[in-house]
């Protein structure tokens, strides 16, 4: 632990200058000064104003770009913060023109004239731009497909109707006849009664 604290203290002392300020490490130029803003007034751009006579475009290091109808590429040099500007005959930047390659160092926000090419460069940071002379392809914006929300169908609960139970109609039971004897017996008895009555009247 003591050794670690000593190393931290030693590093802090080494980073302090005589005036008491912290010395910042020099940024890596390949990551800080990696973009360049170019402009041209050598007639490569449309002088009638259809396009701006100054084509401002960010160009990444080692990327072939067409700026004002000229193919250019800025390459990283051999020493720190050194770059090379070169024009090419082809759009893949493999055939250099007869123009001499220009070597320059990059200082942030300092504009540099690049020889007879009348290109200028401002070292800056940002995103690689598209070619200013090319018409960007118009990609139609895709209409998002709206998926309708599927509301679940609620099946209604059917309550069965309670039909009252109808009691079956029971026909009244006919009580058995209490008359005894057959029909002939009744007739005979009636005849006997009539005979007795007639006999009584005859007396």
UniProtKB/Swiss-Prot annotation:
Its main location: membrane. Glycans are attached at residue 58. Residues 127-168 have a biased composition (Low complexity). Residues 1-20 form the signal peptide. GO terms for molecular function: actin binding. Residues 183-203 form a propeptide. It is found in: Cell membrane. The keyword Glycoprotein applies. The GPI-like-anchor contains a phosphoceramide group, rather than a phosphatidyl group. It is a lipid-anchor; GPI-anchor. It comes from the Eukaryota. Residues 127-183 are annotated as: Disordered. A lipid is attached at residue 182 (GPI-like-anchor amidated serine). GO terms for cellular component: plasma membrane; side of membrane. Keywords: Actin-binding, Cell membrane, Glycoprotein, GPI-anchor, Lipoprotein, Membrane, Signal. Transmembrane segments: none annotated. Belongs to the ponticulin family. Binds F-actin and nucleates actin assembly. This is Ponticulin-like protein H.
């Amino acid at each position: 632990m003591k050794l670690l604290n000593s190393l931290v203290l030693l590093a802090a002392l080494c980073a302090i200058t005589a005036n008491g300020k912290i010395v910042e490490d020099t940024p890596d130029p390949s990551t800080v000064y990696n973009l360049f803003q170019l402009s041209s007034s050598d007639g490569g751009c449309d002088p009638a104003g259809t396009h701006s006579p100054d084509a401002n475009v960010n160009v990444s290091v080692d990327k072939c770009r067409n700026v004002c109808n000229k193919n250019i590429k800025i390459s990283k040099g051999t020493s720190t913060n050194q770059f090379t500007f070169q024009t090419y005959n082809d759009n893949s930047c493999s055939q250099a023109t007869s123009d001499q390659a220009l070597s320059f160092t990059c200082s942030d926000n300092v504009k540099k004239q690049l020889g007879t090419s009348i290109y200028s460069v401002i070292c800056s940071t940002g995103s690689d731009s598209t070619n200013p002379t090319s018409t960007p392809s118009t990609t139609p914006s895709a209409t998002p497909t709206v998926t309708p929300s599927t509301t679940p169908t609620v099946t209604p609960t059917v309550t069965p109707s309670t039909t009252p139970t109808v009691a079956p109609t029971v026909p009244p039971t006919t009580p058995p006849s209490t008359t005894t004897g057959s029909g002939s017996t009744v007739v005979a008895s009636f005849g006997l009664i009539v005979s007795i009555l007639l006999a009584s009247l005859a007396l």
